[in-house]
Amino acid sequence: MNDFKIKLGAINGGENCFSFEIKDQFFEEFTLSDVEYANVTATALLDKEGDRLALTLTIDGKINKLLCDICTDEISVDITAETKVIIKTTDEDLVSTDEIFYVKTSENAIDLKQLIFELIILNLPKKRQHALSKDGSSGCNKEMIELVNKYTVKEEKSSDPRWDALKKLKIK
């Protein structure tokens, strides 16, 4: 897909703004991702001053059909994030970092696909669950919660007698 490439020749001095729509087909190329459905807008603001090229990449939208960690129902998650990267052209094969994105001098475009993907994945919530309602109750599937509670094995805490003896010591 060439949809996420910005031609270096199209970048004028000053600020240049590019917008990309991230839909479901975007994630087909990334097989190890648990994100398959999305409606996200990515905005790339390129600021060119002489040879210096600074990129501010912003994403805003919704990731759909993620599974709730508690009840496994599908949920949608809002996502908003921003990152700033310096783009440098080089003749060498250098590995890009979080702060610097290297582009070969022979290339005529910057491919933002991987950067956009990483920004989305790294800004997903760690715990994915239904939002709590105003009264504090969960939006989780009640039938599934009942099944989870029914089949959850409660572990009894067994203590080591050696530690129990130490607990009896009183330190002044």
Q: What does each model-identified segment do?
A:
Residues 75:
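Cys/His-rich microdomains that often coordinate metals
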Residues 78-81:
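Short Cys/His-rich "knuckle" micro-motifs
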Residues 1-10, 89-172:
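Charge-rich, low-complexity linker and terminal segments
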Residues 68-69, 141:
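Cys/His/Pro-rich metal-binding microdomains
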Residues 84-88:
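Short beta-strand edge segments in extracellular beta-sheet folds
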Residues 1-68:
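A positional/architectural concept
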